[in-house]
Amino acid sequence: MTEERTADNKAAKAASFKRHGSRYKARRRAVDILFEAEFRDIDPVEIVEERISLAKDSANQVKPVPEYTQQIVPGVATNLDALDEAIALHLSSDWQLDRLPAVDRAVLRVAAWELKFNDDVPPQVAVVEGVELASEYSHDKAPSYIHAVLDGINKDLQLQADLKIADASAAKRAEQAEQPGQAESDELDGLLDGVVQESDEA
């Protein structure tokens, strides 16, 4: 019975993978590489470069690294501290980042990078795809807590964006308040013209 259920799960994951587009597959490859890098304790960018080199020779039977994967992995590596800080901030007291399954960390980092550093991806898409990766890779509890973490990061970013807009609007209003209004300026011009005219008549 257990073997049948395992086979069914694998079949379901395979079918789900086929339904997803190229970007999902690129995210999936990025998770694989980040997981491998942590397991081997090496720079994930080195793995990307290695795979790119090996893929040039068909005899190696290495799949080409998608362009988006080549963007994600260095992005995560470069901004790792900021990503981990954002993730840790939204973990419940029951979870600690360094004690999470390595695959969960990889999924969270990929999705968090998209939220924080890739404006081309709509935030909700980054969240949904991250949860989907968790469903495919990790344990049953992973999707729900990963969704909560990513949703928290997204809300923080939206709040920061709203505050920037509010600050810019306030600064603009303050600048306008310091300048004479158009009506006052016109009135001043009229008074000056009157003074000049009286001077000419005199």
From Swiss-Prot:
One Pfam family recorded for the sequence: NusB
Composition bias type Basic and acidic residues, residue spans: 1-11
Keywords, sorted A to Z: RNA-binding, Transcription, Transcription antitermination, Transcription regulation
Disulfide bonds: none
Cellular component GO terms, alphabetical: cytosol
InterPro entries: NusB-like_sf, NusB_fam, NusB_RsmB_TIM44
GO molecular function annotation: RNA binding
Region of interest: Disordered: 1-21, 169-202
Keyword Transcription: yes
Single GO biological process annotation from the record: transcription antitermination
Transcription regulation among keywords: yes
Family, as annotated: Belongs to the NusB family.
Purpose: Involved in transcription antitermination. Required for transcription of ribosomal RNA (rRNA) genes. Binds specifically to the boxA antiterminator sequence of the ribosomal RNA (rrn) operons.
Name of the protein in its database record: Transcription antitermination protein NusB
Name of the gene encoding the protein in the UniProt record: nusB
